[in-house]
């Protein structure tokens, strides 16, 4: 995919900021959801001015660039829920968008495999759920049919989802940004938002008074003035909300997922995505086999508490991030309910042999000599004060002048990458209704 045409402006370009510091809407966060939302808004309202403010020097650096790359079909989610609707819509929009833009993807399918008899009723219930969600081409298949698709996979029965695919979501995110810029939007990187408040006076270059009454400052003291703000801050959504005087709830607790990778000479053993039957007692899906666009195969991930919000390595540590997490009562309530599974995840994170044992339930031929440690990602898990994982989308604003001009996307849970274009349409509608665009 051609991505060299994307032009971003760093906040250190003071000439740009002096000449172009006022916008109708500023979107905080240059990940998939922020970029898709900004793109949707500028396409709907080409006469208005929009900016994306991203704290990193590049776009899609964190969750958007550290995910599994799966285009989910919408099987897992409660029928009628927002997640289910947005995933099914989003998958179709994602494929259509990739076709239009020439972004490579592979519709390699997914098998959800029951390896024990007790998992079969749950697998059948998952099939019924998928049908209710209108997932395309879903079917239950026998062990023989499963092995025709995945010759090295073992199991009693599988749920076959041929509509599931894979893509490089960073390419998708950069394409959103390119669309946004071509439509007149501005992308400001290296702009870490540290303050939002009502402006006491108009910007120096303005001849329109306080038409843009909200001032957004970054860590360097540079300013952008706008009428409205949409925040899609991912791992920092709670802190960005607090900056504007809005509620810190729900809190973000970071969970790191470590992947293993199959050695290149062993990748022939996996053709499509292979997933376990989810256990309703545990909050995450469990280890799985994920082919990648570059031909590699990722295994995992686990799910362990990260000691830093952008902590991609085992010993990455931030006193503030760690303190915020361990002092939050909601985390301790979550831990107390999932102590055994949490300890198992920590054990598997430290010992490859424990992860391999889980993988061998599906592909017995995989050995510890076939794998290497791979990349990691950090998931922004929203958690309420009772220790419940917030499983759906959360939007809020605040009170007073500034709160009425801000829409915070507090939680955009997995599969937000798959659903990003559908989420963007929902956010754009919310912005139009709240702010009267």
Residue spans for each PLM region:
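Flavin-dependent oxidoreductases
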Residues: 36, 196-318
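Glycine-rich FAD pyrophosphate-binding loop
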Residues: 42-65
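Short beta-strand to alpha-helix junction loop
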Residues: 79-89, 113-122, 160-181, 188, ...
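Glycine-rich active-site loop/strand segments that organize a redox cofactor
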Residues: 60-90, 100-105, 306-343
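Dinucleotide-binding Rossmann-like beta1-alpha1 core, especially the glycine-rich loop
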Residues: 69-149, 155, 286-287, 296, ...
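Beta1/beta-strand and adjacent pyrophosphate-binding region of the FAD-binding site
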Residues: 19-33, 51
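Helical element adjacent to the flavin cofactor pocket in flavoenzyme catalytic cores
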Residues: 159-228, 232-233, 239, 421, ...
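C-terminal catalytic lobe of FAD-dependent flavoproteins
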Residues: 329, 334-437
């Amino acid at each position: 995919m051609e991505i060299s045409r994307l032009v971003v402006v760093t906040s250190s370009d003071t000439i740009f900021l002096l000449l172009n510091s006022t916008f109708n809407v500023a979107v905080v966060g240059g990940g998939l959801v922020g970029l898709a939302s900004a793109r949707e808004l500028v396409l709907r309202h080409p006469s208005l001015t929009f900016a994306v403010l991203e704290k990193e020097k590049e776009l899609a650096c964190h969750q958007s660039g550290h995910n599994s790359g799966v285009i989910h079909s919408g099987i897992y989610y409660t029928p009628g829920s927002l997640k289910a609707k947005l995933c099914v819509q989003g998958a179709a929009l994602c494929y259509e968008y990739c076709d239009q833009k020439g972004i490579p993807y592979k519709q390699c399918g997914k098998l959800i495999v029951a390896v024990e008899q007790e998992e079969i009723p749950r697998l059948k219930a998952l099939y019924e759920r998928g049908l209710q969600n209108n997932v395309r081409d879903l079917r239950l298949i026998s062990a023989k049919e499963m092995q025709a698709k995945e010759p090295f996979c073992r199991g009693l029965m599988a749920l076959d989802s041929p509509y599931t695919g894979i893509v490089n979501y960073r390419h998708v995110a950069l394409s959103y940004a390119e669309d946004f810029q071509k439509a007149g939007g501005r992308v400001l990187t290296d702009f870490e938002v540290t303050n939002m408040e009502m402006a006491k006076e108009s910007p120096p270059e303005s001849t329109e008074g306080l038409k843009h009454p909200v001032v957004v400052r970054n860590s360097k003291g540079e300013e952008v003035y706008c009428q409205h703000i949409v925040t899609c801050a991912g791992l920092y959504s709670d802190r960005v909300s607090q900056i504007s005087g809005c509620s810190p709830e729900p809190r973000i607790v970071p969970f790191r997922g470590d992947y293993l990778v199959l050695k290149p000479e062993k990748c022939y053993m996996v053709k499509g995505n292979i997933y376990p039957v989810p256990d309703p007692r545990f909050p995450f899906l469990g280890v799985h086999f994920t082919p990648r666009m570059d031909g590699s195969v990722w295994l995992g991930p686990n799910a362990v508490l990260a000691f830093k919000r952008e902590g991609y390595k085992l010993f990455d540590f931030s006193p503030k991030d760690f303190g915020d997490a361990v002092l939050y009562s909601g985390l301790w309530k979550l831990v107390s309910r999932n102590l055994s599974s949490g300890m198992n995840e920590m054990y598997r994170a430290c010992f490859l042999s424990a992860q391999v044992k889980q993988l061998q339930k599906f592909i017995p031929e995989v050995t510890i000599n076939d794998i290497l440690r791979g990349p990691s990602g950090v998931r922004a898990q929203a958690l309420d004060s009772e220790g419940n994982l917030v499983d759906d989308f959360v939007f809020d604003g605040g009170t007073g002048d500034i709160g009425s001009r801000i829409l915070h996307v507090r939680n955009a849970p997995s599969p937000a990458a798959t659903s990003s274009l559908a989420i963007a349409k929902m956010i754009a509608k919310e912005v139009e209704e709240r702010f009267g665009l």
